């Protein structure tokens, strides 16, 4: 029997991005392999019709998955015994694709979101679940931390927040860990103000915040330094070969979402 899912607003985006990964996995020449997402979609009682028609959302999710999977895997290969904190995890399954490459993995999201995750994914170690907001500093108490290296992933969240909330999230991270790297997805202000994704608008979630680049983000969270910026154009190149050409155009790279790598050293 399929499980009914009732979500609206920003939490609903987790179901739509899950569908995008499952849909790509089913393709003959799939660029990602997310069998867990495929299985979850089969067991969800949810109308995926808007997500299925939203090509922009689908391409964006897969491009982001390609880029972040690559970046996280490379990081974990260089940094043994890392604690990974996945903020606003939704129904993300990267922890399974990276299994065996980290010490502990903590999936964090709002209680109503984690209630849905627990229906389908029982995680009891080395993958753990924390049902709290990333702006609630008590989530740190649920992390078994003894000065290990920490990687924080913030994917698909910042564009729904405001600058004050961004500062709060980074402040908690900065105060809690001695050595920490943050991989955060950001959206350009142009896209926030002028672009609408059909499935996102249908969920009543709205884009509200963006930054042009890492330097702009560093001005907001000066305790961190920018180490790297990777445009999601790099993922689009694997989905649409034309991006090998148009991806060189500055405006295309500038308005594409980015993964910005920030570091704080003790």
Regions of interest found by a model, annotated:
Residues 138-147:
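Short amphipathic alpha-helix with an adjacent loop that forms part of the alpha/beta core around
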Residues 152-153:
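A conserved beta-strand element that flanks and buttresses the S-adenosyl-L-methionine
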Residues 160-173:
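A short, conserved alpha-helix within the catalytic core of class I
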Residues 189-205:
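Short, glycine-/aromatic-enriched active-site segment of Class I SAM-dependent methyltransferases
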Residues 1-85, 89-132, 146:
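Rossmann-like AdoMet
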Residues 204-234:
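Short alpha-helix
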Residues 176-189:
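Conserved beta-strand signature within the Rossmann-like core of class I S-adenosyl-L-methionine
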Residues 240-266:
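Core SAM-dependent methyltransferase catalytic element
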């Amino acid at each position: 029997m399929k499980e009914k899912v009732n979500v609206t607003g920003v939490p609903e985006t987790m179901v739509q991005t899950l569908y995008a990964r499952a849909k790509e996995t089913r393709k003959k020449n799939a660029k990602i392999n997310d069998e867990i997402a495929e299985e979850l979609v089969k067991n969800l009682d949810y109308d995926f019709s808007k997500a299925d028609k939203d090509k922009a959302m689908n391409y964006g999710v897969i491009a982001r998955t390609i880029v972040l999977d690559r970046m996280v895997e490379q990081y974990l290969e260089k940094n043994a015994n890392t604690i990974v904190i996945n903020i606003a995890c939704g129904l993300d399954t990267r922890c399974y694709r990276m299994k065996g490459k980290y010490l502990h993995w903590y999936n964090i999201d709002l209680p109503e979101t984690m209630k849905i995750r627990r229906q389908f994914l029982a995680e009891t170690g080395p993958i753990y679940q924390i049902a709290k907001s990333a702006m609630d500093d008590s989530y740190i108490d649920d992390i078994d931390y003894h000065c290990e290296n920490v990687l924080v992933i913030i994917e698909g969240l910042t564009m729904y927040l405001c600058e004050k909330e961004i500062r709060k999230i980074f402040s908690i991270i900065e105060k809690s860990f001695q050595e920490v790297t943050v991989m955060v997805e950001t959206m350009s202000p142009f896209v926030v103000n002028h672009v609408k994704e059909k499935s996102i608008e249908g969920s009543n979630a709205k884009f509200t915040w963006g930054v042009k680049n890492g330097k702009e983000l560093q001005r907001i969270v000066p305790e961190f330094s920018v180490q790297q910026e990777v445009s999601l154009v790099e993922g689009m190149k694997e989905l649409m070969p034309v991006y090998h050409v148009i991806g060189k155009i500055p405006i295309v790279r500038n308005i594409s979402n980015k993964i910005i790598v920030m570091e704080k050293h003790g």
